[in-house]
Curated annotation (Swiss-Prot):
Gene3D superfamilies listed in its UniProt record: 6.10.250.2150, Glutaredoxin
A biological-process GO annotation: cell redox homeostasis
Protein name: Bacilliredoxin BC_2157
Family: Belongs to the bacilliredoxin family.
Pfam families linked to this entry: Disulph_isomer
InterPro entries reported in the protein's UniProt record: BrxB/BrxA
Length: 144
């Protein structure tokens, strides 16, 4: 049984989840869903590690959504895991990131299971939305 805090957090993050879903991202909320996706998917995938922090709200989520709308070349798949909320799913996805340290929010572009581009939280916090969008568009152009 969950406590009041956990229920409050589940309700609070609904709009944060929906922002990426409305942009075409598939939520992976369990370890099994991550494994199923990663083991049965080919091509390129943009993974957004979502978060409740301000830089996720003001920069990461809107930048990811705009980049996939604006880019000429786009990843084959768009998925998201939610750090701090879907802990098992996030931990499982991070296993596929190899030696890259945990960072949330963050964005990873994968070819198959290989990370070919990664944007850490500190790169999101210190950037404008346009800089993040350009960063993603360039990664898409090179890898998709």
């Amino acid at each position: 049984m969950s406590n009041a805090y956990e229920e409050y957090m589940r309700q609070m993050v609904i709009p944060m989840r929906q922002e990426l879903v409305r942009s075409g991202f598939e939520e992976l909320t369990t370890e099994e869903a991550v494994t199923e996706f990663m083991e049965n998917t080919s091509g390129t995938t943009l993974v957004v590690v979502n978060s409740v922090c301000g830089c996720a709200a003001g920069l990461a989520r809107p930048s990811a959504g705009q980049a996939v709308v604006r880019a000429e070349k786009q990843p084959d798949h768009l998925v998201t895991v939610f750090a701090g909320q879907d802990k098992d799913a996030t931990a499982k996805m991070r296993e596929y990131f190899g030696e890259i340290p945990p960072s949330s929010p963050s964005m990873a572009l994968l070819k198959g299971k290989e990370v070919v581009h990664f944007i850490h939280r500190h790169e999101i916090e210190g950037a404008t939305m346009d800089e993040i969008i350009t960063n993603l568009e360039q990664a898409f152009e090179k890898n998709c």
